[in-house]
Amino acid sequence: MRHYEVMVILDPDLEERAVSPLIENFLSVVREGNGKVEKVDTWGRRRLSYEIKKKPEGIYSVIDLQAEPAVVKELDRQMNLNESVLRTKVLRPETH
């Protein structure tokens, strides 16, 4: 398994209480693929440096996880299919 960091920017029109269940829904893909979610850090509403899908701000969330590459690819695919997700970025942090 590899370590990944996933940043997701959600639609600012979502209610605060709807953010956590939405992220948990995405993370079920990781858990079903025998991956491990290490940390979920929701930063809240932040102003974007440029508009994405005509939205000037978004709800940022950073997820640290360990999973196989195919599981992370499926997670990214599921997130991109959801209309509440403005942008995703999957990174593999460097380990020294």
Swiss-Prot record:
Keyword entries, A-Z: Ribonucleoprotein, Ribosomal protein, RNA-binding, rRNA-binding
Example GO BP: translation
One GO MF term: small ribosomal subunit rRNA binding
Entries under InterPro entries matching the protein: Ribosomal_bS6 (IPR000529), Ribosomal_bS6_CS (IPR020815), Ribosomal_bS6_sf (IPR035980), Ribosomal_S6_plastid/chlpt (IPR020814), Transl_elong_EF1B/ribsomal_bS6 (IPR014717)
One Gene Ontology CC term in the entry: cytoplasm
Gene3D superfamilies membership: 3.30.70.60
Signal peptide: none
Domain of life from the UniProt record: Bacteria
Record family assignment: Belongs to the bacterial ribosomal protein bS6 family.
Physiological role: Binds together with bS18 to 16S ribosomal RNA.
NCBIfam families per the UniProt record, alphabetical: S6
Protein name: Small ribosomal subunit protein bS6
